[in-house]
Each structure stands twice: as C-alpha cells, then as structure tokens.
C-alpha cells in the first residue's frame, strides 16, 4: 500500500501592511497543527509591496512551517515587483514553480506563471518539457496510472486546459469570492467557477476564496 500524502492548500495570503506577521504567525500555527507532508500556495503571497515583509522579517515565519512549501506566482507578485517577490520566495524557503515542474515520488506539481505575464508558456508546452525531462511518462495521455498531476495556476481562466492536458487536480485562487460585496456577482460572471469544487472529465478543480484580502 502506498502511503497517503497530506497536503495543505493555500492561496491569496496578501501579506503586507494589512495582513501582518502577527496574523501570519497564527496561520502558520494552524497549518502546522494539521501536520501536512506538503504545502502548496496558489499565488498572491505578497499584497502590494515586499517592503513590509522585509521590515517584519516575515520570511522567518515561513521557516517555522514543518513541511516543504511550493508556490506559483500571482498577479500581486507582479504588482509588488516580480524580481523582489522572487527574492522573497527564496529567502522564505519557498520553492517557486514558474512555468516549471517538481516531482515528489509519484506526485508531480506543475506551477504556471501568472497570466499577468502574457509571454508565459502554454500548459501544453510545460507538460511537453516535463515529459522530455522524465518528470511525466508518455503513457496514458501523458502520465502513467500511478502518477498524480497537480496544477497550481493563480487565476482560474480556461479551466478546460487542465482537462485537455491530463491534469488530475487544479488549485487556483484570485477571485476572493464572497469576501467583498458585490465582488461575488462579478466573479460569478467572469469565471466558469469562481469558488469551490468542480469536475471536468477526469480533472478535479478547487477555486479558493483565499486566506486574506
């Protein structure tokens, strides 16, 4: 029997002048209490500036997490200066997946760049590169039966791409559905799924309303 893997999924922490280190400290305690094997974050860790995270040494709180952290970028990482955001990810010990793939046992984590970058790679291109590197086998529509493919893509547009590329599970955020009125009406109109779970073919999806705003 294969050991199950416990994953904590987060999105949209928006750490900065509003959500401070003291807030994040409580979230870290909650996450550690779950005793996860892995932590995945679907973008927008940073709000609008890296400065308050540096001033409060928020990276130290990330180092208290008891499981490895993998994350993709969100649009706010671009608003806050993407090179500085990438530097913060490194200092915080976060493995950034930016149109790239990580393999952990039979689990394959694909992290897309945010669609703010109009030159980001297509999901099909990322998958093809992963196959060439041996991260994903060429069997059964791009993966073997014991592989599980997880996609992190901050903004939940074009959900059909994950299904078309054999993804097992996509995790997204961005919408903040239900957190601010009347944003929920707008997000329901903009996205095929603005919050919660969805299944398309063999692909399951979850769109998070996020931790902070």
Which residues make up each language-model segment?
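Soluble catalytic domains of enzymes that build or remodel membrane lipids, polysaccharides, and related
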Residues: 2-213
């Amino acid at each position: 029997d294969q050991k199950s893997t416990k994953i904590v999924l987060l999105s949209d922490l928006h750490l900065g002048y509003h959500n401070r280190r003291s807030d994040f400290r409580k979230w870290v305690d909650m996450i550690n209490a779950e005793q996860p094997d892995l932590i995945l974050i679907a973008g927008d860790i940073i709000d609008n500036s890296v400065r308050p995270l540096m001033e409060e040494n928020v990276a130290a709180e990330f180092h208290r997490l008891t499981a490895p952290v993998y994350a993709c970028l969100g649009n706010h990482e671009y608003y806050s200066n993407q090179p500085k955001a990438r530097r913060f990810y490194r200092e915080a010990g976060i493995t950034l997946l930016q149109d790239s793939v990580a393999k952990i046992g039979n689990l394959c984590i694909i992290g897309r760049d945010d669609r703010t970058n109009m030159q980001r790679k297509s999901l099909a291109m990322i998958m093809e590169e992963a196959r060439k590197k041996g991260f994903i086998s060429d069997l059964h529509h791009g993966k073997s039966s014991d592989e599980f493919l997880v996609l992190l893509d901050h903004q939940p547009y074009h959900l059909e791409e994950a299904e078309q590329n054999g993804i097992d599970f996509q995790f997204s955020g961005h919408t903040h559905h239900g957190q601010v009125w009347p944003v929920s009406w707008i997000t329901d109109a903009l996205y095929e799924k603005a919050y919660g779970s969805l299944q398309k073919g063999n692909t399951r999806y979850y769109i998070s309303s996020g931790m902070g705003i």
